[in-house]
Each structure stands twice: as C-alpha cells, then as structure tokens.
Amino acid sequence: MRGGESIDTSMGLTPLEGLVMGTRCGDLDPAIPFYLAKNLGMDNQALDDLLNRRSGLLGLCGVNDMREIYRRIAQGDPTVVLALDVFCHRLRKYLGAYWIELGRLDALVFTGGIGENDAVVRARTCAGLEGMGILLDEAANQSVGKGERRVSRSESPVAVLVIPTNEELEIARQTLEAVGG
C-alpha cells in the first residue's frame, strides 16, 4: 500500500500466481503444464485440478494444515521441512520485491490465518531482514493474542504488525458500496 492505495498484488489473473498456498502452486515455470501434458498425458482439467487443488503445501509434503506440518517437523520429516522452507522463501521473495517497488517500508503486516496465528512463519519471514529495518521482538511474536498487535521491537524502523482480517465484513462493505447503499 502506498498512500492507502494498493500498488500490487501477488495474484495474477487467478490466485495461482504468487505465493505458495495450501493447495495452490504459486509462481511456477510456465513450461511445466506443457511438460505435464506431454509427458504425463494430463488434459486441461487434470492440470487445473493439480495446480489449484493438489499443489502448494499439499503437493510439497502431503498436508496443508500448519498444525500437522509442525507435528511432522517434530517427528523429523524432511518433506515438511522443505515445504515450510519453500513457503517462507516465497514470502520473503515477495516482501523484497514490494520493498523495492515502494522504495521504503513503514510497516509489515501479517494477516489471515497463518499471518495471524503462526509465530514461526512470522519469525522465519523476518529473519535476517534487519538491514531492511525489520527488528522482530521474539517475545511479542510468540505471545498469543487477539486483536491488532505490534510484534516488532520498539526501536524497529519498520513496524511489524499482526492485524486480524474480517473478510466477511469487507465483502459486505464492498457489496453495499456496489449496490449504492
């Protein structure tokens, strides 16, 4: 956001572009669907199903529930470690791209299910980004809380915030605006 206006999104025409998600692939080499069609005989419907519903975390490690991922990490499963590495790497990659596009960063906001509830993903995303002015407060990050909260250190040039989302309320607001209410 710049001046209250969105300047970009990680999604393209569809949510397939961008970040790795629970079941969606995120960015991938455009030749992959052609390769799969040619070498595995996959048709358009099979490719759509694979990329939208059987990829992402699910495709990388077999599960898309972060609780199960952490349970399996504790058991030493290397596939879930890889999946979490890929997930956080993509977050950091997009964060860096947006930082460059904006020219500076005032705040890094974590929202949505994982952003609001997963201290490990927040910590791994922020790790090593002190040069960007992101100084995470580990204790604040680990604390469980509801509502908006700051999880960066007080001296952090960039505020790191956890802000709960209310998608239903936003949909209702936009619907009301669209119908002229």
Where are these regions (language model features)?
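Alpha-helical scaffold segments in soluble metabolic enzymes
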Residues: 32-36, 46-50, 68, 97, ...
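Short beta-strand segments
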Residues: 1-2, 111, 163-164
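Internal helix-turn-beta structural module
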Residues: 81, 85-101, 105, 115-181
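Generic structural signal for well-ordered, non-membrane alpha-helical segments
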Residues: 25-29, 40, 44, 62, ...
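Short gly/pro-enriched beta-turn/loop segments at secondary-structure junctions
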Residues: 28, 52, 64, 103-105
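A mobile "lid/hinge" subdomain adjacent to the ATP/sugar-phosphate binding pocket shared
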Residues: 40-83
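Glycine-rich phosphate-binding loop of actin/hexokinase-like ATP-binding domains
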Residues: 1-38
